[in-house]
Amino acid sequence: MALTMTAHFLRNNPIQLGLNLRVLLMLSFVSGLVYGSQVIVPPKVNAVLGKNVTLSCRVQVDTNLSLTQSSWERKLPNGWVTLAVYNPMFGISIPPDYERRLSFRSPSALDATIMLEDVGFADIGVYTCKVATFPLGNTQASTTVSVLVEPKVYVSAGSSALIDGGNETTVATCIAERARPPADVSWETNLYGMSEAHMQEDANGTTTTQVHYIWQPSRHAQGHTLTCVVKHPALQSDFRIPYIINVQFAPDILVLGYDGDWYVGRENVQLKCRAKANPPAQHFRWIRLDGEMPNGAERVNNTLVFTRPLQKNDSGVYRCEVANDIGLHSRDIRIRIQDPPSTTTMPPTTPVRLLTADISATAPGNKQRALITSPTLAPLHEGSLGTIVGGAVGGALFLLLLLILAGVYYQRQRRTFRGDYYTKQYHGPSDMQKAPQPHELQQVYSKGSPDTKLKSNQDNGTIYPDKDREEWGDFDRERSPNGRSRALREAGQLNHHNHQNHEHGFHSNHHTGHPQSYSPAHHIQRSSLQPQPRRYPAPQVMSNGSPYLPEDCYDNEYVSHTDGSMISRREWYV
C-alpha cells in the first residue's frame, strides 16, 4: 500500500521526484528487514495435572535489529492477558496472579522461555510469545497447552472366591481411574480366559477404565500370575501390576510307606498320608474297610504306625480321609502281609583262584557271602565263577572243532583230481600231466596182455629218450625216436629189471622213409640184451590243436592216475 501511494504521488508531483526517491528507498529497506527476526515455539505442549510445565520460546534476531522487549500473553474469553514481560533495560515484570507460579527460565535477548508450576485445568488454553525489535516492530508465535491427568491404577480381586471346578467368574479387575485422555488397560496371562472392559466419564473430562478378567477356576492354575498393564501419555513407561491367582480346592491325597514287601515279623513300618489342599487340610483320619483296626496300629496325626512286628491278619484295605473347608477326600490302599523270607544257608564252596583275584568261600554256618578282593577286578556275584569257567571251556571246544574241520578239508583238497576227464583235450598246467609212477604202471601193464607189452627198437635194442607230454607243444619240430611217452619208456625199463627170467618177443616192421607201423607182439626167449622198444607212429596234431595221439595209437584205453585209480580214455565221468 505504501509503495502504491508513493508511485501515485510521484506521478502527480514530478518536482519532488528527488525527495520521494529517497523515501522509497527507505521503505524498501524496512520491508527487507521484516524477514530478519523469528520467534520459535512448539505448536502444542502437554502438561500433567499438578505438575510443572515448560513453555519454550527462542528468538532469532538479525544483527541490524535490536531487541526492545519479550513477553508472554494468554487469550481468555474476555481478551488477552499479559503473563510476563522481559525488558533488557527495565528487567522482568509478572502480574500478581502468576507471580508464585510463573518465572523466566533464563531471560535474554535470544531466550524468552517460561516455567508454569502446579498446572491445573484452568491453565488449558493458547499462549503467545511476543518479541518487539527496533526498527522492525513486533513478532509473535503461539502454542496450545493441554492438561493430561495421570490415571490412578490398582487391581481388585473378584467378588467371589475361586473354587476348583466352579463356573466362570471374575478373577480380578484392573482399574485406571480418572485419566485424561482415557488409559489403555489390558491383562497379560497364559490362561484361557477373556477380558471385559468398562469405561466411565468423570468430571473435568477424565475417564475411568475397568477391565475384568473372566475365567473358569481350576486347581492346576493355583499360584499362576495375571499382570495388569496400563498405557497412558502422562506415564513415562507402561504401568504393570501382577496379581497371583488363588484357587481353592479339596485335598489331593498321597499315601506313602508301603513298598509291597511287607512280611510277617517285619518291624518299624508305617503308612503316611500326605495332602495338598487350599486352604490347608485340617482333619486326618485312618480307618480299615474290611475289618477292625488291628491292635498295635496307632494313629498319629496323618500317620498310621505299627508299633509291633507285622502279623498275617494285618493284611487288608486301609483308608486315609482328609478334609478342609472345601470338602473331604479319601485314598484307599491294600496291604498284603507275605510269609517271612526263607533262612536257608548257602551250600559250602571251595576257594577258586581266578587271575589275580582272591576268592574265599563261605562256611556252612556262616551267613556272609563270598568275599572277592582284587586290585584289578571288581567283586563277582555268586555264580559268576561258574559262568566264566563254562565260557572258557566252551570257547576251547569250539576252537578245537574248527581245527578238526580245517584238517579234514585240507586232506580232501590234496586228494582231489585237478585234471580233466576228457583226455582228448589238452590243458595247460604241467602239474595236471605228471608222469605216472613206476609202481602205478606196474599194476597196469604187468598182466601180460599182448596189447600192453613194451615194444623194443629193432635197430639197436635201446630205449631213446623222449619228451613228456608237457613238451608236445613242439612235437612237430622235434619228434621222439620211438613215438612214445616217458611213462611208457620208464615202465619198459622197470619190466626189464623185474622180469629177467621171462621171455618177451617184440617184432616190428620198419621201412625207411615211411611212417612207422606196429603189429601184435609175440613171445620170444629173453636174451641178455635189453628189450627192444617198438616204434610208434608219430602223433598227429589234431584239427583242434591238441597234441594228443589219436585213440587208436594207445595200447590200452585206461590210464593210471596219481592216486592209484584207473581212468578210461573213452568214457565220460560225471
From Swiss-Prot:
Ig-like V-type domain: residues covered: 36-146
**Where in this chain does the record put each Ig-like C2-type domain?**
151-240, 251-336
Extracellular topological segments: 36-387
- Which of the residues are on side Cytoplasmic? 409-574
GO CC annotation: what is one?
A: adherens junction
Gene3D superfamilies given in the database record: Immunoglobulins
What is stated as this protein's family in its record? Belongs to the nectin family.
Q: What is this protein called?
A: Nectin-3-like protein
**Natural source organism:** Danio rerio
Provide the gene name from the record. nectin3
